[in-house]
């Protein structure tokens, strides 16, 4: 194959699949003290009036780059002031990946709070698989350097303003 053909073929690779390297299981991170079970089934956590909207999307994959259909993703994060809703389900929800392992979450950009940079918690589970609990971080956030839990490999890739991409790699 000629160099030009290889470069041209590389341009055909979708953005999903570039966000996380297959073969490497997404690193586990702490659940933290604010997880609440039984979140509502919903792909949008928006409740109206929010200013810093975010669309986070990606694919749930196996280590050999196969999509994980119907994977369960449970998301939660702080609000615009860095507080978690511990009585209800504001900025909490779960969804299932589609037949190609894709997910799409509409939410806000959460605030940082003392000791923590901006992040989104997530539990990912393949059907009948183990739960992977982790966190997704924002690229270039100044708080990343101060956060002892931050891992650069858990940064979402910025697709464009207000959109991020992160692919999860899980064992099935």
Show where each model-derived region lies:
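N-terminal secretory signal peptides and thylakoid transit peptides that target proteins
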Residues: 1-13
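Beta-strand-dominated extracellular/periplasmic modules and repeats
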Residues: 20-172
